[in-house]
Amino acid sequence: MNDVVKIVEDFIKPHIPKPFELFAVEWEKFGGDMMLSILVDKEGGIEIDETAELSELISPLLDTISPDPFPTEGYLLEVASPGAERPLRKAEHFAGAVGEYIFVKLYQKINNEKEFTGDLVSFDGETLVVDVLDKTRHKNIEIPLSAVAKAQTMVKF
């Protein structure tokens, strides 16, 4: 996790009002600018007008972080829902995604594969068990959380 993400996450988390929760903070290049994406959610999903209200709350808060972690040339702010295909970055994200269809990309191969798509059967805090389709058979693949480079929920068609 980079410094801006950690600083922003630690700073704004206590300011997010109930029933909302801070899902993730992302700091990425977007065209020629830097984009700070603050992903918020709530039980049952979040509405667009709620993200607008949260943006009005969060934007001035970010200006009070000291020392200022942002580049002098500024950045773009986005407050949004994690969406249907939401990123899975923390242990609690994986725990909440048990039973869902996911995509996982690994740092190193397991069973000669670096990417898996399937149902997340279980997660014990350290290991994911993913039910993947191997040709015509289903099989469970155990993936250590430490081996996961990227993961997200997927919409299954």
Swiss-Prot record:
Q: Mainly resides where?
A: cytoplasm
Upper lineage is: Bacteria, Bacillati, Bacillota, Bacilli, Lactobacillales
The coding gene here is rimP
Keywords of the record = Cytoplasm, Ribosome biogenesis
Q: Which residues form the signal peptide?
A: none
Q: Name one GO biological process term.
A: ribosomal small subunit assembly
Where is it localised? Cytoplasm
One Pfam entry for this protein is DUF150_C
Assigned protein family: Belongs to the RimP family.
Q: Which SUPFAM superfamilies match?
A: YhbC-like, C-terminal domain, YhbC-like, N-terminal domain
Tell me where on the tree of life, at the top rank, the source sits. Bacteria
According to UniProt, the name of this protein is Ribosome maturation factor RimP
Q: Which GO terms describe its cellular component?
A: cytosol
The reply on keyword Amino-acid biosynthesis is no
Q: What does this protein do?
A: Required for maturation of 30S ribosomal subunits.
